[in-house]
């Protein structure tokens, strides 16, 4: 996602780190990914900048995304001898071009096969909710930049919607309210 990357295998969380890359300001070399990137930045903030290669749930930098995926796959699946098949959750509004680019980056990062599923559907599956009956299930997934909503019934998707509103928007509104209320500059 825009903020966090999580890798699960057989229901077990193998990795959870920030989706961020540390880059050297002097030569644009990659210095680290995830937690390592944050550490590099806090150690030398004048020399290091942080790049977030995913924005609004979409990849905005192929090179950084491929690098971070490769690093996270090796770190999260360090005991695996084979190339993994990967199921990735993505925003429902992601374009077909963006989907293809993400599959390509993931394959080049070391995946044997890549399957894409909407974030709202992934949340349903992750909770173990059965979609076989006629009951209607609403799934709302709020990320850093976007909120993904899905309505499911009779084993399928009835409707999906992506909103350009996420956790960062809420944080910014709270900060603005506190600033305005307390007259803080």
Predicted regions and their residues:
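Nucleotide/phosphate-binding catalytic cleft detector across ATP-hydrolyzing
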Residues: 2-144, 152-185
